């Protein structure tokens, strides 16, 4: 079973949902950013170090995946996503893009 780690801006929530849904039917395991479907600040209040910890955890997901898939609608890649792509390339993971 293939493990796909999805990366991209959280502004693309609907696209993350779409790709996660499709992964289920392809028999793939989808790894998504932390709390993809919860508004952390609204639900739990400001968490000062949450983003740093979530970013580090997402890199551990990249460590265990077979492939990284970048959700980059209109070619948009933010700073955090760029960091994840650079990390994936550094450790030899294949990286595919929604928009090339």
Predicted segments with their positions:
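Conserved catalytic or regulatory cores that recognize and/or transform ribose-phosphate-containing ligands
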Residues: 1-100
